[in-house]
Regions:
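Alpha-helical DNA-contacting segments of helix-turn-helix folds
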Residues: 51, 58-65, 72
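Helix-turn-helix
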Residues: 14, 18-58
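Hydrophobic/aromatic-rich alpha-helical bundle segments in the mid-to-C-terminal region
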Residues: 119-127, 140-197, 201-203
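Active-site oxyanion/phosphate-handling segment shared across diverse enzymes
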Residues: 129-139
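Amphipathic, non-transmembrane alpha-helical scaffold segments
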Residues: 12, 16, 62, 66, ...
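Hydrophobic alpha-helical connector segments
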Residues: 60, 74-104, 152-155
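Amphipathic alpha-helical segments used for helix-helix packing
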Residues: 84-87, 99-126
Length: 203
């Protein structure tokens, strides 16, 4: 690949990465193309060398944000010899995650935008949430597939909802109460004494 093509590919990647972070921080409609390009010290007109439209950037940026969040979730759940649901929940419902939207969970940050976007965007969310459910179901361990999925769905919904609510009320006693209470209830679901259930041994 020639130098100009490498440079263009690098700029394209920078645009997608920056958009993914800013969308999580401000919402999909919370930053203009002009501001995004200015933040990256690029010309507004140069945008169309990389994308046919803003919607095309949105699609790519959401794909990146959702994939990265999903991979971070899986990495945290399976970082040791045994699944660590407690560790994942601790990190997810930490105040630093509440306050760090740009580097945090894309589903919690952007799910509110999805109903107003295209069917393609909604399909992206659906695909990633299914992947997240699969990862959490696997981490939960023994039990029927239906039971594990139901528990995983309840936990994920509680996580997304708690983070959204905690952010909505700002850094306040209520915000901290939401994080603390939901964490405790989730750990009661995920195994005895708040510890992750052991996975079934391979036969």
């Amino acid at each position: 690949m020639g130098h100009s093509k490498v440079s263009k590919a690098n700029t394209h990647a920078r645009l997608v990465e920056a958009a993914a972070a800013r969308f999580k921080e401000r919402g999909v409609d919370g930053i203009s193309l002009a501001d995004l390009m200015k933040d990256l010290e690029l010309t507004h007109g140069g945008f169309y060398k990389h994308f046919a439209s803003r919607d095309e950037l949105v699609t790519e940026a959401l794909e990146l944000a959702l994939t990265q969040s999903g991979q971070a979730m899986r990495d945290r759940l399976f970082s040791g010899d045994k699944p660590d649901i407690a560790g994942f929940v601790d990190v997810y419902l930490d105040e630093s995650h509440r306050d760090g939207r740009a580097a945090g969970c894309a589903v919690a940050a952007l799910a509110g935008d999805a109903p107003r976007k295209s069917a393609e965007v909604q399909a992206q969310f659906r695909k990633q949430i299914e992947r997240n459910l699969e990862a959490l179901s696997e981490a939960l361990g023994p039990g029927s597939a239906d039971e594990s999925r139901a528990t995983a769905l309840l936990i994920l919904s509680a996580l997304y909802g708690a983070l959204t609510m905690a952010r909505a009320v700002g850094d306040s006693p209520l915000s901290r109460e939401v994080l603390r209470t939901v964490r405790k209830q989730i750990l009661n679901l995920s195994g005895p004494a708040g510890k992750p259930r052991a996975r079934a041994k391979a036969k």
